[in-house]
Amino acid sequence: MLILWLVGAFIVLIQWIYRLNRDYCILGFFAKRIRTKNGQNPESIAPLVKGSTIFANSFDLYGKDHSGVFEHSRDCAKKLGKSYAEYAMGTAIYNVIDADSAERVLNDPNLINKGTIYDFLHPFLRTGLLTSTGKKWHARRKMLSPTFHFNILNQFQEIFITESLKFLEQFKGNDEAIISLNEVIPRFTLNSICETAMGVKLDEMAEKGDRYRENFRQIEECFIRRMSNPLLWSDTLFKMFAEKDYASALDVVHGFSSEIIAKRRDQLNDEIDSRGNTQTAEDELFTSKKRFAMLDTLILAEKDGLIDHIGICEEVDTLMFEGYDTTSIGLMFGLMNMSLYPEEQEKCYQEIQANIDDELNILNIGQLNKLKNLEYFIKETMRLFPSVPAMGRETTRETELSNGLILPKGSQIFVHVFDIHRNPEYWDSPEEFRPERFLPENSQNRHTYAYIPFSAGQRNCIGQKFAMQEMKTLMVALLKQFQILPEIDPKTIVFQTGLTLRTKNQIHVKLVRRK
């Protein structure tokens, strides 16, 4: 009798577990399942990645290095051929590799919250423009948008020219030089963002700038280590087992940005003193400045009670990260491609010679806008090598997508820009480098969201025009003086996941001075 009772209880338990498992991925730590509007199997729309352990996809990245983490997403996209789903650590994850889904996600006003993974950046960036949500994000976006107005960007052109010429000075007296782009380009972009956005030259802080970049890499290392190990997703466990080197790196980068802010405050106070140190003098300073740094906007907003010092620190850390790192990636791969495709380089060079005077001090945005071949070249570079290969969102309520999927509240959505940009549905021979793809006649029928290097929708990159202007200016200056030759076989490049797109190996090019 007891045996029959136990058998019956076991059957009931199995039935209960079966019913529960229809709504929750039990072994994925009770992740609520994705479902469909019409009741069809969601895997017919978004195939499910087979987990590496019995715990669904929770430990798929465990033990993988930076290259392994990067390749995991690429392998899933190639194997499944469409946007796909995963379940990990109690969460449903929808991975987008098609333009239709990307458009739906990036345009949804209810999907502006960044994914949970961005929480790992809070100790570094706190809740600045990149990581904030809701009213705070809207207020900060509104506050900072005017600082990227055409008139402001036009004022920055003088700095971009100066920094570009300073970049070339390091090769003075050399007819040729082999350089590591990973070393020289980040220094250039950090100098540029500090002088334009912060109003502070790094000439006397070069060593501190180098320390900033070194410790930025340490922060990135900890971020990837944490992302790939679910055991470290807990703040408590991360602090117990992995935070020591992270904390010291944070001290360095925050100390650097704080010094930048302090220097700019001192400069502004000195200007006010020179005008008579009155409220009128202070008001006139902010209304009559010839060049208005983005940091000035934040300091002015502080005086109006719209932001506090911590808020300024948040936005400075964010602007420095996004303005220095993402642009350097675009330039590194852009100059690499210049070396690998000599015919395209020559086309850009001839266009520059036809439109730009040798006296670069008078180079303006209007002239840069005439360089269409260079623009197509940069766009094709960013298609193949997007600085940010993926971006994340989190659903704050049950969300229905255009393909019929219904994502539960708290689901994570990753828009894989790298895979969308190489999706053969939108790009013929997607692995080939062909700038002519961006000619108007070749672009007009392409899905708008098949190319999103600066994201899209209301959370698109606020500084995309700034980045394009900076990249064009350096490329013009460099091509005016040098021919760029290859020193790397592109087949040997090993990509890595980071805060932005990384390579395991250094990218070298050879500069040969033009006669």
Curated annotation (Swiss-Prot):
Top-level division of the source organism's lineage: Eukaryota
Major localization listed first in the record, in broad terms: endoplasmic reticulum
One function term, GO molecular function aspect: monooxygenase activity
GO cellular component: endoplasmic reticulum membrane
Gene3D superfamilies (alphabetical): Cytochrome P450
Residues that, per the record, bind heme: E322, C461
Cellular compartment(s): Endoplasmic reticulum membrane; Microsome membrane
EC number(s) reported in the record: 1.14.-.-
Membrane topology summary: Peripheral membrane protein
Annotated keywords: Endoplasmic reticulum, Heme, Iron, Membrane, Metal-binding, Microsome, Monooxygenase, Oxidoreductase
Enzyme class, spelled out: oxidoreductase
Family per record: Belongs to the cytochrome P450 family.
Entry protein name: Probable cytochrome P450 4p3
